[in-house]
Regions:
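Short, conserved, GDST-rich strand-edge loop motifs in beta-rich repeat architectures
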Residues: 92, 141-148, 234-258, 349-384
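Residue position within the beta-strands of beta-propeller blades
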Residues: 138-139, 183-185, 233-235, 297-298, ...
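Residue-level detector of Asp-centered blade-edge/turn motifs that repeat once per structural unit
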Residues: 131-134, 176-179, 226-229, 290-292, ...
Length: 435
């Protein structure tokens, strides 16, 4: 039997009327079940997201709290390290020295001619220069070795150079006495020493003569001068630690201004040591008058040169019988040298620091600078190329003869005939100027 279109449509209508409600009910139940499952899943996702957000907020809160505590701890540690941490040389308040007016002296630039420069090869950091028997001698350390661990006395005639003797430590100064013996000031991390090398044993042995004063190790020895009577004068910059060498000790004294520098005299005849003058804020240079009767001492912190009778004992800088011969200097004086005509040469390690002297009465700020470390302290002091690196003055009438420029951190000065030789920090050359 064939089913026509009408019959087929009737069958579909009867089936839909019979099964349709059940199918619709089934689909409705299935859709409701699916909607409820989706709703439960959505609620679970929302609860999970809320839980994650809460945990994240709690973690961030704990992190912020820990960061705050850590930051406060770091800040407190920094405040302690810069303000309250005990230091060996607490700063002392002082009155900043006046600034001298222009002297009108002749301006002389250090020579740029290579013929006026004494090359020292690998040697660097010239700390002292002397002339003897037509040769120029320089105290320097070998740049090929660890800095300041081993120093040599180098002799040059302008064409060649050779090491005369070597010492362990920093050779901060040397001087020849009337007998030709060599007197040295040597600084090591263990302390300073005054040493002697006899003229017939150079290169063989260096004898330590003075290593202690009143049972305490000698401090930062900075200069030595031999008198015509055989007595030997030597300076101790101050009571600072000597672990990092003379330059670091001088910077520390500039910032602390403890006034603990001393000048001593050693008499080889009876091997006695006596105090000449104390209360110096960085005794960094010595010079004797041509007749050996007057002693000049450079005072770093007070920017002056003290003058006194070489036979005087137990003086105080600025006190009775020890007055400032030249004050208000434009820089912090270091090495001194005296010519036969009484002309005194004053070298400057650094130019005057306006920040330091502005805070002369502030022990807080200078204490922070002392605690901040050596790298920061080095940035506080410098010597621009246009600033005086040395000056020449007549000790007879006090007239300023010449101002030298073009150097950097002048550590040594030595007049020889028509030239003046200069040593500069970390320089591999002995510089000079024609006069």
């Amino acid at each position: 039997m064939r089913i026509g279109l009408v019959e087929f449509l009737l069958i579909l209508a009867i089936a839909s009327l019979t099964v349709g409600p059940q199918v619709a009910l089934f689909v409705d139940r299935w859709m409701r079940r699916a909607n409820r499952a989706n709703a439960r899943a959505a609620r679970r996702r929302a609860e999970y997201a809320a839980q994650m957000a809460a945990e994240r907020d709690a973690l961030l809160k704990r992190f912020r709290t820990a960061s705050t505590v850590f930051g406060v701890g770091i800040l407190l540690a920094l405040v302690y390290a810069l303000v309250f941490r005990p230091i060996d040389t607490p700063p002392q308040a002082y009155t900043a020295p006046e600034v001298r007016q222009s002297t009108g002296a002749v301006q002389t630039a250090l020579s740029a001619d290579s013929r006026d420069v004494l090359a020292l090869g690998d040697y660097q950091g010239v700390d002292c220069i002397r002339e003897q028997d037509g040769f120029v001698y320089a105290a320097a350390y070998n740049g090929a070795t660890l800095k300041k661990r081993k120093s040599d006395l180098v002799r040059t005639d302008g064409g060649s150079f050779s090491a005369i003797l070597s010492v362990d430590g920093e050779l901060t100064g040397f001087a020849f006495d009337a007998d030709g013996d060599l007197w040295l000031t040597v600084l090591t991390p263990g302390g300073g020493a005054l040493c002697r090398a006899r003229h017939d044993s150079w290169g063989a042995a260096v004898e330590q003569v003075v290593t202690q004063i009143d049972g305490a190790p000698l401090g930062a020895v900075s200069a030595v001068e031999a008198g015509p009577d055989g007595k030997v004068y030597f300076a101790v910059a101050g009571g600072e630690a000597v672990d990092n060498g003379l330059e670091a000790a001088l910077r520390t004294e500039l910032l602390a201004h403890t006034g603990t520098g001393w000048v001593y005299v050693y008499d080889p005849a009876d091997r006695s040591v006596q105090r000449v003058v104390g209360g110096v804020a960085g005794a960094s240079g010595l010079a004797l008058s041509p007749d050996g009767r007057t002693l000049s001492v450079s005072d770093l912190g007070n920017r002056c040169v003290w003058s006194m009778d070489a036979d005087a004992r137990e003086l105080t800088a600025g006190g009775k019988n020890c007055q400032s011969a030249f004050s208000g200097l434009p820089g912090y004086p270091g090495a001194l040298a005296m010519e036969a005509d009484g002309t005194l040469y004053i070298s400057y390690r650094w130019t005057r620091s306006g920040w330091l002297e502005k805070n002369a009465d502030s022990t807080l700020l200078r204490g922070i600078a002392l605690r901040a470390g050596q790298n920061l302290q080095e940035k506080l002091f410098g010597l621009p190329s246009d600033a005086p690196c040395a000056e020449a003055v007549s000790t007879a009438d006090g007239s300023w003869k010449r101002t030298f420029t073009g150097g950097s951190s002048c550590t040594a000065v030595c007049p020889v005939g028509s030239k003046v030789y200069f040593g500069a920090a970390d320089s591999a050359q002995v510089l000079s100027a024609r006069i």
